[in-house]
């Protein structure tokens, strides 16, 4: 029966596949750095989105699979496109970009506020950052995926944010932007060396706004290795 063999080959990546994902991640981080530079008061969303896409292309990307962008109230669109809306100081930005290299796709998303964040926005963002940093502790070979999901959800529960946590915090990556595994809190499968995954940690419809974190990792014998180090550095730093 070939299907289980093919599924296993898709879930556990070869060294060459990991190298392609790492390069896609590098290009995505280059693009996101430019997005952060252009997401300023008075600029349209399309300018920041276009700057990110152009920088990723200049870094070697063969395709931008998608660009999700929303500022202010538009963060609630979840997967909305960039528009001509003018961004303003104090608005939160939700922006995700999926970058393809040699057929392999890495996605990055870092939630932030233009200008100075309010105390409420800082609390909201730091909850997301804490959940993402806690997730790191469970990205090890032999760890049950459901345990990772439960511990991410526990962070949201601690702060009374469970009702804004609408879907599981991780999926696989590879030839598709999102592919197996898709763990939830009941998953019994274990992480294995060579698996490549993307965090998808989000809160939607909270009074402070809506946003999401996406960053890529390869599971190694020593734990998670970032495929998108520019984003990992920002999240680890927090506010």
Regions found by a protein language model. Name each.
Residues 1-239:
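Active-site neighborhoods and metal-handling regions in enzymes and metal-associated proteins
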């Amino acid at each position: 029966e070939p299907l289980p063999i093919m599924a296993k080959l898709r879930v556990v990546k070869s060294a060459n596949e990991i190298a392609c994902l790492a390069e896609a991640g590098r290009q995505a981080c280059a693009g996101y750095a430019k997005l952060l530079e252009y997401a300023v008061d008075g600029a349209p969303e399309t300018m920041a989105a276009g700057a990110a896409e152009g920088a990723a292309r200049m870094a070697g990307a063969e395709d931008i699979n998608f660009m999700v962008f929303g500022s202010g109230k538009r963060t609630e669109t979840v997967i909305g496109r960039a528009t001509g809306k003018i961004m303003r100081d104090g608005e939160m930005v939700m922006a995700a970009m999926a970058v393809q290299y040699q057929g392999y796709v890495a996605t990055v998303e870092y939630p932030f506020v233009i200008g100075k964040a309010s105390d409420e926005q800082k609390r909201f963002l730091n909850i997301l950052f804490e959940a993402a940093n806690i997730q790191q502790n469970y990205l090890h070979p032999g760890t049950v995926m459901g345990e990772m999901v439960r511990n991410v959800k526990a962070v949201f529960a601690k702060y009374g944010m469970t009702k804004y946590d609408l879907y599981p915090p991780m999926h696989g990556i590879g030839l598709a932007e999102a592919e197996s595994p898709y763990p939830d809190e009941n998953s019994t499968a274990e992480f294995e060396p060579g698996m490549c995954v993307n965090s998808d940690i989000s809160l939607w419809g909270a009074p402070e706004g809506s946003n999401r974190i996406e960053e890529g990792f390869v599971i190694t014998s020593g734990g998670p290795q970032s495929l998108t180090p520019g984003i990992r550095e920002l999240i680890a730093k927090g506010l």
